[in-house]
């Protein structure tokens, strides 16, 4: 599943092409994806100008004139591609498996932009993605967003914030960090990497990073720095291309080449001076990769 850096890459690829364009017509080729489309969805968004494309956690938000927002989630295999004239482009494309079968083109947005007419096509073989319609003035209270934690890309994520969220928690640290109510958009790959960088065990009780007065310990300060750095590095690299991600220009992201522990079970730990071996365990149904020797 695409995580925050991959969705951010999609946003950055799509935005220059669609912002300011007129959404002439929305074409739905089936009544549902993971969930049914909202009633009269196609009619509600057609004829509206696209004001902005943004991201919150792992959601894309397409702001339309009039105050409506198309909320899109890519699920496991969703992709957006742009076809302009006879020359297809692939901004923000995700794919599973690599390549596209047009029978999985479920939504087509027909646009008229500054460079002419184009089609923005949503392709999703597994149909775990979805689209919904919300109002911008109440979107913070929407069920998708109201319980989300702070983003790992902004200044609001600091040690004091995370200490308040983790204080008293006995659950494993990795499990606590994957809770979207703690940090929005943070997923499995980047939690593993951040824990390795900060030298913290995924099995450690989350509350042990907070002192009795509720203040962050030094280990929590290091963790916050690692989370922010890992996410920034991944965005700069265009995300991680395992089987799900390709960049806006059709090239692959390359952060997976910088993985220190994720998907490296059995390899020597890359931390200088550590002679440990990367180990894979399962936590809450997900693979966790860590070095038991240097992560405490």
From Swiss-Prot:
DNA binds at residues 104, 126, 169. It comes from Sinorhizobium fredii (strain NBRC 101917 / NGR234). This is Formamidopyrimidine-DNA glycosylase. One of its GO terms (biological process) is base-excision repair. One of its GO terms (molecular function) is damaged DNA binding. Monomer. Signal peptide: none annotated. It holds the Pfam family Fapy_DNA_glyco. Binds 1 zinc ion per subunit. Involved in base excision repair of DNA damaged by oxidation or by mutagenic agents. Acts as a DNA glycosylase that recognizes and removes damaged bases. Has a preference for oxidized purines, such as 7,8-dihydro-8-oxoguanine (8-oxoG). Has AP (apurinic/apyrimidinic) lyase activity and introduces nicks in the DNA strand. Cleaves the DNA backbone by beta-delta elimination to generate a single-strand break at the site of the removed base with both 3'- and 5'-phosphates. Keywords: DNA damage, DNA repair, DNA-binding, Glycosidase, Hydrolase, Lyase, Metal-binding, Multifunctional enzyme, Zinc, Zinc-finger. Belongs to the FPG family. InterPro entries: DNA_glyclase/AP_lyase_DNA-bd (IPR015886), Formamido-pyr_DNA_Glyclase (IPR020629), FPG_cat (IPR012319), MutM-like_N-ter (IPR035937), Ribosomal_uS13-like_H2TH (IPR010979), Znf_DNA_glyclase/AP_lyase (IPR000214), Znf_FPG/IleRS (IPR010663). Its cofactor is Zn(2+). A zinc finger (FPG-type) spans 260-296. It catalyses: Hydrolysis of DNA containing ring-opened 7-methylguanine residues, releasing 2,6-diamino-4-hydroxy-5-(N-methyl)formamidopyrimidine; 2'-deoxyribonucleotide-(2'-deoxyribose 5'-phosphate)-2'-deoxyribonucleotide-DNA = a 3'-end 2'-deoxyribonucleotide-(2,3-dehydro-2,3-deoxyribose 5'-phosphate)-DNA + a 5'-end 5'-phospho-2'-deoxyribonucleoside-DNA + H(+).
